Amino acid sequence: MPNLRALCQAYLDGEADPDQVEEAFREARGCTKCDTGGVDHLRAIEVCRAQRTVEWKKKRRSMVTASECAAVLGQNKYDTPQKILMRKLGMTVFKGNKFTQHGQDMEAAAIARYEVETGHTVETFGLMVSPDEPWLGGSPDGITQCGRVVEVKCPVTREIVPGEIPRQYMAQVQQLMHITGLEVADFVEMKGPEEFQIVEVKRDPDWWNTHEKKLREFHARLTECLEDPTLAPKPRRRKKKKPDFDFG
C-alpha cells in the first residue's frame, strides 16, 4: 500500500494526479461503521443524480441552493444576494478559478481519506430538494450510509483553524441538514497530507425558523425576475477586477 500522506504531497507538488490519489485511498478504505443501503430513502428527494451537468445547472437556476445560502443571508463577505441573483438570471457568469478547480480536483481524495479515518462509507448524491420547500436545494459532497452529511473544502491558501468552520460555510451545512432531515454533518477540510480535520456539526433546530423569511423573500424575487426579465436588476459598471478569492 502506498504512503497516503506522501501521495497527497506528491499531488500538491504536481507529481500525482487526482485519480491516482483517489484510487490509493479507495484501496485503503475499510468500512467498519456503516450498513449498506442506510440512506436509500434519500434518493426520493434527489432530482438530479450527477453534479455539474447541464441538467443540474438548469434545475438549480430556480432554487436557493445550499452553496448560495450564506450569500443570500448576508453571511458571506465574498458574495452578495445581488450577485447571486444576477448569476441565476444569466446576467453574469462565474467560470471558476484556480481555487475552485483545486477544490474539485481534491474532493474525492479528501472523501476517501475521511472514509479511512472514520470507518464510514460515503454515498454520492446529486441535487436534492426539501420535501416541504421544493425551491430549496443542495448538492452534498456526500452522505454516509449511517446518515451523516459530508461537506468538503480543500483550501489552497486559507488557513485551517482547528475545530472551526468559516462562517460562510455554516449556513451551507445547516441547509443541507434541513433538506435531508439528517441531524449531524461532518465538515471536512484538507490542505495537504499534514493538514486535515473533521469538525462535527449538529443540526440547529432554530436555524430554519430564523432564516426562512429572508430565504423565501429572495426566492420570490428570483421567481419574479425569471418570469418577467424586465424586473431584473440593472447591471452595474464593471470595476477593476480584484484578485481571485480562495473559495476552498
Where are the model-predicted features located?
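Acidic-basic catalytic patches of nuclease active cores, encompassing PD-(D/E)XK
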Residues: T100-V122
